[in-house]
Structures are given as C-alpha cells and as structure tokens.
C-alpha cells in the first residue's frame, strides 16, 4: 500500500529536483507572501482553498526557465501523479499525464519520462488505502522542502542562523493536533488525525496557499522538519551527518504511522506559538533583505506580492466542550483566487520546519492537564500559517545555487529530524508525527473539492489504522524519489545547513517552555479517559503493516536501482557500512516483529483458555487485584522515569555537537529499557489501566471477542511504546550519537517481560483452578462410589430379603403340598372305605343304591366321588355331565394315587369273591379287556337283582327301552353343543347318522378313522339255537381250536386288515369329495393361526382304548356281581326267568329288526367260510378306522351316570346268566397257561412295528402310558382282527398318541401338522396318488364296522324257549352296541381335524414360501400349485400366495437400496468393489428374514443374485437414475431372469413336518 504512495512521492520529488534552475523568479513573491500571512489574526480554514493552493503550489514548483507551456505540462503531470492517490481513475490520470508530456515540449521530456513511470506505478497501486498514499505524499513534500531550505541556507552563507532556528520553532508550534472526530484511540487516549482540518482561508487571501500547499498534495500537512546541520560549517563531518539523517528519517516515518495524537492541553502550545510568531517576523525581515541583495535581477516580485496580499486567514473556533468533532466551513469563493495565484516552489518549507517546533510545544501540552482543545486547534492553525512566511524568504536564494544530490538532500533531512528529536523533549514526538500520518475528514473533503474526485469516508477512517511498518517504505522511497531528478552535487549547500542548525539550537535554548514545562510530564491519564473513545481496529493496522513494509521495500529497489548505482559511486565506505548496519537493524526489527506475532498468538491462546475456565466470581476478584497492583507499579515507574527525564534531556540539548560519536553503535539493555519507559508515559499509563480493567471485566458471554479486543489494545500500546523511541534522537540517558534504531530492543524486552509475567500469572491461576477441579472431581467420584456402594448394599439386602421370602414361600408351598397329600390320602382311604361299604351293601340294597361307577384310569377318587354324587336315581342328565367335568379336572393330579387305589379296590373286591365264581371271573376278565361285553354282563347282573323287586317285568322292560332312546338323543344333543366345530358341520353329521347307523356309505367328511370296532356281535345264519349255552365254557373257542382252525383265524385276521385298509382309503375319498364342496371365500391374512385340536379336560368322547382301560380296572367287581347273580338265580325257577327274558327280548326285538336285517346282509357279503365242514358258520370280519381322539369317552359317561339306561337294559342280559346257570356250564374258561395265542403274537408284533415306524424324535419313548401294551390277560372270545384293531392296529388311540407326542414337542410350533394320517402300518410319508387310486377302486365298499360274536359248537342242547330268548337277548345287545357306536362316531365327527386337502394357507405354508424365495423371486401360479400339493387352490388362496412373494420381493429390494446408498456415501467408486460374503450384514439380514431358524442351507446362487442386485442398485444411484419415476423397473427385469428351479423335495406333502 505504501509503495504506491512512494511511487507518487517519487514522481513529485523528481519534478521538484529536475527543475532546480527554474525557481529563481518566485522568491520575492514568497517573502512578501509570508509577511502577509503573519499579519492575519482571524484564521478560518476552508477546504476548497487548501485544495486549490496545493495544486497551485505544485504548478509553481514546476515553473521556471521553461516556457509557459512546459510549466503547465509539468504542473498537469504532477497533478496526475498525485491525482491517482485520491480515488481518481488510474487510467485517466495516466492518459492525462501522457498528454501533458507531449504538450510540454522537448525541454521537459527527460523529467516527464521519469515522472510518467512513477505515475504509472502509482496507478498500479490504486488499491492502496488513502491514508498511506496521503502520508507518503506529505513526506515527499517534506523532503523536497528540506532540500530547498538547505539550498537557501547555503545561499545565505549562514547569515541568519538564529532567525532560521526561531523560524523553525515558531512554525513547528503551529502544528496542532487535528480534530478528534475522524478517529479515536484505544485505552482512552485520542489520536490526532490532522491539523489542516481546523484551517480555512478567507476571501481572496491567496498568500495562504503556500501554507496548505503540501497539505493538498500529500493528503496531510507537511510536518517533517528540514533542519540543517548543527555543525557551524564544518565540511569534514558531512558523511556523519548524512548517516544520522538517514537514521532520523527512518525513525520519523515509524513514528508517523505508530504514534498517538494528544488532543488536550493545547493552550500552552498557543502561548509559545504567539511568542515564536514575533521571532518569525524578525527572521522574515532579515531573509527578505538578504534575498533582495542576492536576487535583484528577478522580475516577478510585484505580481506575487499583489497576489499574496489578498489572502487572509481566519480560524473560526467552535466552542463546544461536549462534541469531539470540529465543524469546518468551506468557502467556495476562495477557490478562484487561490487557483490563479502562482506559488513559490518552496512553499512546503514552512511545513517541513514545523515538526521541530511542534515537538517542543507538544512537550508542554503533555505536561499541562487543561482540556481547552478547541482554542488550541485554532491557535495551532494560526501559528502554522504564520510560520510559512519566514520559510519562504529563504527560498529565493536557490536561484543561483545548484541543488545538492539525492544523498545529501536525504542526509540533510535526517539531520533536521535529529534536531527535531533533541528539542522535542521526548514525548512531543508522538502527537506531532502522528498528525503527519493521519489526515482528518476535513482534509479529505478539501482535497475532493480541489481535485473534483470523491474519496470514501471509510477509506479515510481506515487511514488511522494503517500499519506502522509502512514508514520504512515511505522514507526510503521518498528519499530516493526526491533525489531521482538531481544528479549534480555541490558542497557549498552544506554551509547553509550548518548555519540553520546553529540558529535552531540557539532558539531551542532560548525557548521558555523547554525547561519550565519538562517537570510537568506526569499526567494521570485515567482521569481524562471519558474524553476519548477506544479504537476498535488496532490489530488490523499491525496485520496490514507487515505486508506494506515488504512491498514498499521491493518497490523501492525496483524504482531506484539506477540512481543507487550512480549515488553509490559518490558514497564513502563509511556511508556504505552504515547502510549495511541499517539493513541489519531492519532485519532485526522484522525478526522482533515476528516474535511479537508469536507472542500475540500465545496471548490469544491464553485468553481463550482463561475465558473457558474462569467463570466464577473468584477470577473477577483476582483480575481486579492484578489490575490495581499493575496500575500502582506502572504509576511508580512512570514517576521515576519522568523525574529522571528532564535533566538529562536538557543537558543533552545543551551539549549537542555535530561530530560523530565513537559510541554510535553501542548500547546497553539498561539504557534501552529506560528509553522505552520514557517514550510516552501518558499513553502507557492510561492504556494499560484500561486494558487491565477490560481484562477484569471479560467474563461476559461473548468471551472470544472481548479477549481479542483486549489483546489488540495491549499489543497496540506495546507496539507504540516499542517504536516511539525511534523518532528523534536517542534517549537523554544514552550516550551521544547512540543509534535510536536499537532502542526498540528495550520496549520489546519490556513487553515480553510483561507478557511473560501475565502468562505466568495466568498459568498459576489455571493450575490452581485445575487443582480445584481435580479435587472436586475426586470428591464427586468418591461420592459416586459411595452412592454406588450404598446402592449395591441396598440391592444385596433386597436380594437377600427376596431370597428369604422365596425360601419362605417354598417352605409354605411344600408344607401345603404335604398337607394336601395327606388330605388326599385321607380322602382316598375314606373313599376306599365307602367303596367297600357300598360293595358290601350292594346286594341287599340294590333298589336304593344305583350301581357305583367302576374305578377307571381317571382315578379311584374320581370314581368314588362320582358314585357318591349320583346316588339319586332321578337326577337330570345335564347335572350328571357337569359333575363329570369336575371329576375329570381333578383326575389329572390323582393318576398315581388312583392306580394304587384301583389295586386296593380290586384286591378288596377279590377278597369278597367265592370259589364258585372263579370260572365266571376268568371269563369276564378276558372279555372286559377287549370289548364292552363285560360291562353288559355287569348291567345284566344288577338288573336281575333289581328285577326281583318289581312285579311287572314286561312294563319295566318296555319303559327301559323307551327311556334308552330318549337318553341317547339327549346325550347326542349335549355332545353337539360341546363340539368346537360349527353347527353346520354338526348338522351334517347328525343327518348322516340319523338313518341307519350301520348302513352309512362312509364316515362324515371330517372323520379320518375307519369303522369302529364296537359293532354288536351277531350269530350267523344256521347257528344252533343252543350254541349260546356254551358261550363261555365251550372247548371250541377260537383259542382252544385245533391248529387248522387257528390257521383259519389267522387268515381271517389278515382279511380283516385288508378290509381295514380299504375302509381307510374309502374314508380319504369321502373326505376329498366333501372338501370339494368347501371353498375359501375370502383372502387370508399373511399368517394364519393354526386351528389345533382342543384338548379339553371336559371332553366327553370315548375311544376303544379308554373303554379297555376302564374295563380292565373293573372286571373283578363285575365278575363278583355276576357270580352273586348266578347264585341267586339258581334259587329261582327256570321257567320264570326264561319267561321274563323272553318278554324283555320280545319288546326290544321290533326296534332292531331292520338293523339286524341290514347287518345280516352285510355279513353275508363280507364274511367268509372258516371251515368247509360247517357251511352255516360265517365269520363277520370287522374293520377298524383311524380316529383322532384320546380323552375319556362318551360311553364311560353313559355307563357311569345314566342310571336309567343301565337299569332298563339289565333285563336284557339276565337271560344270559340264567342260561349259563341252567345249562350247567362250567365256571372256568380256557386255561391261562399254554402257548401264546395268535392275538397275543400279533399284539407284540404290532407294537414293534409301531415303535419302528414311529416318526423321528423317539416317539416310542415319548408315548403316553395309555399306549403301552396292556397287562397280560386271558384269551378272549373276540376275533384276532378285533384284538389287532384294539391294540394299535389302526385304532384311533394310536393316532391320538402320535399327535400327543408331536404336541408335546412343540404345541406352538407352526411346523406341526395336525392333518397326518399315520396309522402305524403305513410308511410315514403317504402318497396321495396311490391313495386316490385305491379309493377309486374301493369306492363302493361299505364301512359299517361290526364286532363278530363268535358262534361255537354247542355241547348241550336246550329247549326252544331258551333258543328264542337267547336270540332276542343277542338282538338287544346288538341294539345297545349300535347306539353307543352312533354316539362315538358323532363325537369323532364333531372333533375331527382339517382333512388332507384344504384351501387354507397356514403359517407353515408361509415358511415354506419364504424358503422357496431363495430359488425363485417371480414364481408363476403354476409353479406355486406344483410345489403346494396339499392345498386346494382357488382364486382367493392363489392370490394370497402370490401376494406373499410380492411382499418378499419388496423387503428384498428395500434392503438392496438401503445398502447401495450406504455404499455410495462410503465412497465406493465402482460396482465391482461390492462383494457379498457369508458374514456380511446384508446377507445376515436376508437369511434372518427368509430362513429364521436355518431350516435349510442357503444356495450359493442366491448369494450371487444378491450381489448382482446390489450392484444394479449401486449403478442406478451412482448415475443419478434414482430421481426418475420408475427407475427400479429395469432392475426388476434383470433380477427376474435369475430364478432357479426349486428342489424336488419341496413338492413333498410331508415337507412341512420336516421344517422343525
């Protein structure tokens, strides 16, 4: 930024020094002009006049011996060069400069070329801030003025040194602090912006133009002091003075961009300025006389005098102590007169000599605490304009003199700056030189009016914040640009400089305010803090400074390499050495600046850490204490420094010599530190106090902003303290000639020590806080541990308490169980006693007590309770069934005890039997175990005992028959209500069984059992009527037949098995036909809950196995009652018994005649001749069907609780007992010993087949105890086929066992099929096709089951009456059997399960469909029907199955898209990088969804399909196709072509059973 200003300054300097021979004609004008300026007392600065006079001054500088056209061209070129600095268009300025050069003529081409180059460089740097450019231009004019003044002094031959010194001092006093409204300082000290903002020119007073010439040209008032050498003409010390000039110029520029302006206590400056104005008038008179003698040949004096006398100055003071701004009134009418007045080329000398005097006057300003700011500004402007007149009197002397070279001019300027520092008493340097660096708003507005170019106010405000390092660029650039146009060197010019230095020194010694006001330096800045506003952007100034410094140095080297090469030839080795030292010092300065930046970073970190951790009130107190302590220390240091400063400074001013000091390059840290402390105590004290207080109040929420502001304030103040000593000469305590460039070391060390101390304090505080936090954390951790321990203890106590409670509960439960067991045992004993009592009293009280229920497998307690509960004969049937349900519920917990009870009861009953009943007992035992014959015998026996008490037997038999039919109908209705099936199915079953029960074409659709084995035995045609007499003791029994007859029986058994299989097939066909009528009318849900068979405790059905169990436990009691019946019957007459039996048989024969005929016809069709010698004997083979029941059955309930039925059919069996007694049949049956019969062998063989053909899962080991083979029993009179049916040979009980085992494995499993038809004889997996073929072959077969009542060869012949009564009795028994079978069949029909072919989809089908998804994703309906053969498909379930696969695909594609997008976000580039392994997450999710229990191994091709699908989705998403509407359709087409054939084992109907 500053490089552009340097370029412009070089252009201006070149123009001034190139035309060094054309400035002789305007000297007298300047003298008259200056004298006129001093006479004005009413000063009123205006913006337009200052801007116009600046342009005029530049034009006058170019005027001389050149023609008027060339003068105008040079003026326009310089205006173009500086016009680029004030916001104008760079292109227009360059073009304007080119045109002016072409019009100037050949005499000005050499200067124009160089000026044009500089102007173009300035145009390239138009981005620089206006503050930098204005400062640079001001310095250029200051340097030019110093050269001109030096030449004037040389011409005067040191005639008036004292007046020159006085003149400089007086002029310097006129530089007052500018208005404070343009910028404010940090820490409460206001910064001076410009002094030209308070000036305005009145009317036609054109002489004031010389005062503000360089203000307009440079953007700020010229404040650099051009002081000649202090050595009174000694030419031997010229080189040393040049070196000092270089150093002083460097320091001055640093102070320009860094210092802070003081806006207070300006009345002292005004008083000194008034005294110096009188001295200026005398000095101006002397100069006028001298110039008139030397330049009497000049012709332009009268014109300039007339023009200059017109100008008058006035200052309008605005007396407003509250407002910091100073309003400036511009008078546009002054512009015309100002622009017409030609100005002296040396008009800037007054400004250049102002810095020295201002230093001394500003010293008094700092020491005085008054606040009269407005008056001081006005008087400052008056003094400045009065100083301009004596300075211009010296300028005409330069006409006959040759200007010095670039080197000498710069050295002279540095000497003057050095003397300025000596006379400034230290602290005035800051405010003076600071005013050079910062023009105010009024300056900018004046320049805008003159140049007709607009400047941004923001750029002007930012001028105050420019970098402090741009001074290096400015000083070197201006120094070389000032001398760029001058190539000749003459030594006599140095004499004038020496004379001026002597006068300046004498004037400083005579100054009344130099020593008197030195002791008033100590000012408590904190009390004045309210007058200032903090500056907010100090950090940005320092950041921008480094860039400007480096760029300016590079630009300097680019522009002036040629001039340096020429000037280096004229320089002595000492000067070159000093230049090297100066460069070294610059490098040191840069390194220190870097260190300072590092310290700033550390401080920022420290502040951030402090802000994060200091949030408690303790930190506020600590900050306040630190602030107070540091303020006290600083105040003490300031007092000591201010006491030590005045005396050395005064002594040093008195002993100033121009000789080079041998200790120029020597310095000590102590001296530098003292120098640092004495730089600006007021600024340091006020800023540090404010910064410390700001740091103490930094605990507000926006902490980082506060910390940065505090840091910026501290760094700005420290940088000012660091660089302020570089302005002027060395500290008074230092040796004479000590290079001030090294003095900033003290400030750096002081700042570093301060920061280090503050850093250590912060570290200590942070360590303390960290220790406190650690202690708090430790305490919290201890508290948490204690709480956890307490919680654990509480939990342990609670656990112990719960354990104790559980133990107490267990103890109580055990005690309760023991108590219950004891009570139960007591009840059992009581029940046993009651049973014994009832059995003992059964014979004498047969009418009062109904037959007690036999002990069954359900338990003796239940049987005894049932016998006690049903003591009343005329109780309702509903009440009986209700009591039965209660007994069944209590029977499960009493199984073990009931078995023992049964044995006890049986043993007690056996003890009551006599020897005469042994034969009958054996026969009854063998018969009861396999059929209902024993039960019928028991009923008949009890009926005989009751019959003796009735007088009318015929009426009793008739009533019994009628009541039997009614009770059977009532029982069927009750069973219908308790069936879980729908009423429609029950009605169908009733209609199917209503006609002829034995003539059914097949079982109901839901029936999966073969024909029952409870059909009544019938005697074949041609049977001997007397054969019944030998029914129990005939040696022709099937088990006592010769071997040939046994072979025939075995053949009959095989035939019965074949017929049984045919009946099963016929049932399948019937079920299929019925299922065709049923159809699924609505769509199913996704998962259908399986309708499992209800295992109710109150189930009223009965199975053959249950009947066998019941009869096996109660055969002894029945046999005992039968024996007693026979003994009592022996005392009656045969005729009476026979008559009663015949009457009873006659009454019931009519009811069963039709059934008998049908059954006889079936026997004729299905029977075979076992022996050819007996043509009339035909054996009726019975078939067994598979049923699905296992609980206690209906018949046991009827036999135990329907007393009316039992009472009315007892008469039907009385004939049998009477015939046995009358015929004299032996009581003993076949012997127990001997070889096992064929039935027993078949039972053992079939049990092995059952275990071997059991499904996996150790079915044989898990079978219920009921399905174990029964106890060995004597041979029965039943056919072996009937025994085979009873012993698991296709019996319903076997299938019940199979389902019970499967339900025990997993009742809730979806994979258990309740539709299997395993009967123990066929393989586990059935083949539907073969079954259908067999069913079609046997479609006409009848499935009415029968029990063959074997007819054996009689050994005794009875009468006709006996034969008739036996036939009638047999018919009655057959009727009872058919009635019981109807009830049993109906119960099976009501509780049957789903048939083989069903239209209902179950959860097992859903699981199968999920597994099929591994092979096919888009199956057709034909494929689905092929792989679901057990489903009868219709439109509803087909759509349901298709919907399942649609849902499968939806889940599949959702997962694919999810993981594809995840892969895109993870940064995968190509689809080939996507690989699906067995342990990948996507593969695991899919397997968990479709193969939850790992039923099958996932095929390898499915992994390939998943991988391809994922890649397709990845390509689509990566290519951006997912934004389209139907972007997935193409992927669906690709995946649909990847289906594979499903394995064949999915077609198996048994596949669902294998899934678990």
UniProtKB/Swiss-Prot annotation:
Any Pfam family the entry gives: HPD
SUPFAM superfamilies, alphabetized: Homeodomain-like
Start-end of Basic and acidic residues biased regions: 286-296, 374-388, 802-813
Superkingdom of the source species: Eukaryota
Residue ranges of the region described as Disordered: 150-199, 212-243, 271-309, 336-404, 448-491, 562-583, 614-682, 802-838, 884-912, 979-1010, 1156-1179, 1224-1274
Domain Prospero-type homeo: residue ranges: 1398-1456
Polar residues composition bias: residue spans: 181-198, 226-243, 390-402, 1001-1010
A GO CC term assigned to this protein in UniProt: nucleus
GO MF term set: DNA-binding transcription factor activity, RNA polymerase II-specific; RNA polymerase II cis-regulatory region sequence-specific DNA binding
Principal location class: nucleus
Nuclear localization signal, short sequence motif: residues: 1090-1097
UniProt keyword annotation of RNA-binding present: no
Biased amino acid composition, Acidic residues: 455-474, 627-646
Domain Prospero: 1457-1556
InterPro entries according to UniProt: Homeo_prospero_dom, Homeo_prospero_dom_sf, Homeodomain-like_sf, Prospero_homeodomain
PROSITE patterns (UniProt xref): HOMEO_PROSPERO
Homeo-Prospero: annotated segments: 1398-1556
Keywords in alphabetical order: Developmental protein, DNA-binding, Homeobox, Nucleus, Transcription, Transcription regulation
Coiled-coil positions: none
Keyword Transcription regulation annotated: yes
Domain notes: The Prospero-type homeodomain and the adjacent Prospero domain act as a single structural unit, the Homeo-Prospero domain.
Entries under PANTHER family matching the protein: HOMEOBOX PROTEIN PROSPERO, HOMEOBOX PROTEIN PROSPERO/PROX-1/CEH-26
Family per record: Belongs to the Prospero homeodomain family.
Name assigned to this protein: Homeobox protein prospero
Species in which this protein is naturally found: Drosophila virilis (Fruit fly)
